[in-house]
Design a protein with these regions (language model features):
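Heptad-repeat coiled-coil/leucine-zipper oligomerization helices
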Residues: 1-20
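Extended amphipathic coiled-coil helices
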Residues: 22-194
């Protein structure tokens, strides 16, 4: 039993140390010190969505819904950047703070926690491109169906494209949470990035 008590004591001590270390860790300071995205910040990332937007993204919305579709489009763009250069990624998330995204903003030369303004900018960029793609889809497909059939498909897809079945605040948070769940990394891995 002395061995067990010693192990339990060591475990409790390590647990206290981990909790203290975790609370003292400042992610923004760490990111500012170790990851600079001066060549490609969050605003550049938002613009790149327009540049890289493809019609298959509209299919993602049609097959799913607005929240899952927009989340997947943003995640796809994040994955493309990761493949090119993970150190150029202007958006991060860590598992120690649930639902928090960190972004790099060149206008203030710093990493910050994403706020509603930045989140809306990101989602608006995707939505704007979805609407353009949807208009093209409508024009191309209007004659391929019977009028009544097309009307049903059009209304169903339009609801998905504009996110009609979610209230505004709710869908933005849901999108942010989907992105967070996909890109979060373990706090333990933060030191392995370097």
């Amino acid at each position: 039993t002395t061995k067990y008590e010693k192990l339990q004591s060591d475990y409790n001590e390590l647990k206290k140390f981990t909790n203290v270390s975790k609370n003292k860790l400042n992610i923004i300071d760490y990111l500012n010190t170790n990851l600079s995205c001066k060549e490609f910040d969050f605003n550049d990332f938002c613009k790149s969505i327009s540049l890289n937007f493809c019609n298959s993204y509209l299919d993602i919305i049609f097959k799913n819904d607005y929240v899952i579709g927009v989340s997947q489009i943003i995640i796809n763009e994040i994955e493309k950047i990761k493949l090119e250069n993970i150190y150029n990624l202007p958006i991060y998330a860590f598992n120690h703070k649930d639902g928090i995204l960190y972004i790099y903003d060149n206008t203030i030369f710093s990493w910050i926690q994403i706020n509603d303004k930045y989140l809306k900018t990101l989602i608006k960029e995707v939505s704007k491109n979805l609407l353009k793609a949807f208009l093209i889809w409508k024009n191309e497909n209007e004659t391929h169906f019977l009028q009544e059939q097309f009307s049903e498909i059009y209304v169903l897809n339009m609801k998905k494209v504009i996110g009609n079945n979610f209230d505004n605040r709710n869908k933005d948070i849901m999108i942010k949470n989907h992105i967070y769940k996909h890109i979060k990394v373990s706090i333990k891995n933060i030191f392995e990035i370097n």
